[in-house]
C-alpha cells in the first residue's frame, strides 16, 4: 500500500495481484513524506506504515493527543482495505481542510478469482503455510466456506465500510496489468 503526496496517488494493495512488484517499482519515485506500508526494505522511506515520518503534520495536535491517541490510529499496513485508509486519512484531512483520500488518484489490481485461488494455493504450499491438502480439497473448502481466505477475493477491500460503493478511481484487471499500469502512470 502506498500513499504518494508528491504524485497524489494511493495504491491499494490486494492479494496475489503483483502488489509487491508494483510497490517495488513505485518505491524509486517516493519521497520521505510518502507512506510505503511494506516492511521488506527501509532506505529512509516510510516503510513501517507511519503516516507522518518527519512529524511535519503532528504539530496540528498537542503532543499528548498525538502520541497517545492519534499516532496509533494512523498506522497503515500492506493489504489495508480502502475504507480504513480513508478513515485514517480523514483524521488529517479535517485538520488540513483538504480531503486527501477524495483528491488523490486511487488504483488497485484485481484478478480472476480462479487464477487468484491457484496462485494462493501454490504460494501457501511453497511457503509451508498449509498442510498437505490437495487443490481439490481447497476447492471443496471454498465451496463450504471453510477455506481461510483472509480477504483473498479482494473486491471487498476496495469498497466502503457498508460494502455499497467502490472507493477506487481505477481498477486494473491483472490479465491487463501492463496496459492498466501504463494508463495509471500516464495519468
Label the predicted regions.
Residues 1-187:
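Membrane-interface amphipathic segments in extracytoplasmic regions
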Amino acid at each position: 500500500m502506498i500513499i504518494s503526496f508528491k504524485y497524489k496517488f494511493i495504491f491499494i494493495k490486494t492479494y496475489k495481484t503483483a502488489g509487491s512488484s508494483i510497490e517495488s517499482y513505485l518505491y524509486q519515485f517516493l519521497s520521505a513524506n510518502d507512506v510505503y506500508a511494506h516492511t521488506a526494505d527501509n532506505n529512509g522511506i516510510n516503510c513501517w506504515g507511519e503516516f507522518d515520518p518527519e512529524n511535519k503534520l503532528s504539530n496540528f495536535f498537542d503532543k499528548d493527543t498525538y502520541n497517545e491517541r492519534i499516532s496509533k490510529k494512523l498506522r497503515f499496513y500492506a493489504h489495508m482495505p480502502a475504507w480504513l485508509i480513508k478513515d485514517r486519512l480523514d483524521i488529517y484531512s479535517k485538520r488540513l481542510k483538504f480531503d486527501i483520500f477524495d483528491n488523490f488518484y486511487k488504483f488497485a489490481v484485481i484478478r480472476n478469482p480462479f487464477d487468484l485461488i491457484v496462485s494462493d494455493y501454490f504460494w501457501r504450499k511453497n511457503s509451508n503455510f498449509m498442510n498437505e491438502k490437495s487443490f481439490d480439497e481447497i476447492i471443496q473448502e471454498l465451496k463450504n466456506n471453510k477455506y481461510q481466505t483472509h480477504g483473498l477475493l479482494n473486491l471487498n477491500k476496495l469498497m466502503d465500510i457498508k460494502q455499497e460503493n467502490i472507493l477506487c478511481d481505477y481498477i486494473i484487471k491483472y490479465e491487463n496489468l501492463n496496459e492498466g499500469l501504463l494508463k495509471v502512470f500516464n495519468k
